[in-house]
């Protein structure tokens, strides 16, 4: 990355095409020093205005350029920062977010989340940022999983389907358990409102999904409640026709 008003360090600065790098936020220039094969210089804008969000955006822009070269690996030189871990995490997140594609219904798809051609992201830093890279990867993967689910139509992402995906999450993590209540269990628990809402859809069976993560233990209990209506038709008579297809995204709250 290059900040506005600054110049590339040598020997990269003497590489053909390097003078085209301006430092303007989101600007990109590719130079060919020989080793490595190519270097993408992305503008980071004013150094004083460089935030983790800008790092996230820069990483996303860089990924899209790298994708055009069918690159399998990206290496970042972490810009100097007071909190390098936060910026490292943001770079990984931005790369992961930009790699998301929804091709579930395209010919040849196996029905799972689309795999990216990118095999690795390396961040060069003198600081201990291993934890930050792991955090960024976790956030990106979880976000993209949610984006995949919200992109599915309501006839696929039914309450039963979401319960199955919750079960997959629990099976993949030792400290995560799942409990699912069906219509009978919901009714027995006195949750008449939830049961009533589900009657608005034909052949739709409600599910109450509870995922529990037991971490280190001994701390306070934190509960997050998400409404996941797989196709929200509430107030459909007063909603404009444009954007009706986005009602399926109401499930994102879960």
How would you name each of these model-derived features?
Residues 209, 215, 222, 226-235:
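Conserved mid-sequence domains
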């Amino acid at each position: 990355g290059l900040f506005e008003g600054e110049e590339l360090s040598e020997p990269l600065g003497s590489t053909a095409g390097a003078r085209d790098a301006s430092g303007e936020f989101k600007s990109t220039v590719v130079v060919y020093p020989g080793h490595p094969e190519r270097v993408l210089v992305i503008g980071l804008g004013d150094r004083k205005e460089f935030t983790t969000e800008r790092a996230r955006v820069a990483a996303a822009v860089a990924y899209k350029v790298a994708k055009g070269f069918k690159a399998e690996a990206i290496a970042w030189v972490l810009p100097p920062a007071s909190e390098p871990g936060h910026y490292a995490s943001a770079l990984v997140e931005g790369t992961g977010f930009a790699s998301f594609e929804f091709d579930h219904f395209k010919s040849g798809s196996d029905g799972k989340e689309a795999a990216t051609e990118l095999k690795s992201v390396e961040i060069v830093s003198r600081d201990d940022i291993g934890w930050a890279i792991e955090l960024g990867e976790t956030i990106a993967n979880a976000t993209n999983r949610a984006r995949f689910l919200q992109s599915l139509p309501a006839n696929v992402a039914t309450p039963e389907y979401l319960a199955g995906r919750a079960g997959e999450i629990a099976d993949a993590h030792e400290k995560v358990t799942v409990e699912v209540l069906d219509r009978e269990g919901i009714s027995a628990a006195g949750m008449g409102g939830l049961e009533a809402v589900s009657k608005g859809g034909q052949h739709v069976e409600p599910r109450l999904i509870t995922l529990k993560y037991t971490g280190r233990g001994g701390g306070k209990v934190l509960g997050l409640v998400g409404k996941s209506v797989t196709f929200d038709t509430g107030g459909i008579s007063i909603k404009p026709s444009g954007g009706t297809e986005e009602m399926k995204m109401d499930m994102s709250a879960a």
